C-alpha cells in the first residue's frame, strides 16, 4: 500500500487526506506546532468526515501529528496543502526528513515548486521530484468545530 503524507491542517489538507484514505492509501496528516489544536481535535475524533459533493464518509487517518519526521518516514508521496506564503517554511520543515528520491506535490502551487526546489537543493536533495497543481485540488472548507470537511463541485 502506498504511504502518503499530507502536510497542511486546513480544509484542503483534511480533504486530500480523507479522500486518499477512503481510496485505500496509508495516509498520515501533519503540520507545524501552530496547528496542533486542529490536529489534536482530528486525532481525538479518530479521523475526518467528508460531506458535500464528493463521496461522503469517514476516513480513519493512521497518523495525525506535528512530528514531521514520523509523518514522513517511509512516505512514497508527500502532498503539501498549505498557502503560498508558507512555502519556504514548509519546505524547510520537511526537507531534513526527505529521501533524495522523494516525490513532493504542492496544491495549489502558485510557482511554489521554485521555492521548494531552492530549499531542497540546499539540503542536497537534487533528485527529489517537485510538482504542483495549477489550482486547489478540491473546493472545500474545514468545519472548525469538528473534524469535518464540506466539499463543493
Predicted regions and their residues:
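A general structural motif
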Residues: 1, 24, 75, 100-101, ...
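NAD(P)+-binding Rossmann beta1-loop-alpha1 motif at the extreme N-terminus of oxidoreductases
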Residues: 1-53
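Alpha-helix N-cap/loop-to-helix initiation residues
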Residues: 13, 35, 71, 87, ...
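Short mixed-charge
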Residues: 46-61, 127
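Rossmann-like NAD(P)-binding element
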Residues: 54-105
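Rossmann-like NAD(P)(H) cofactor-binding subdomain of soluble oxidoreductases
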Residues: 84-147
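Conserved anion/nucleotide-ligand pocket segment
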Residues: 147-153
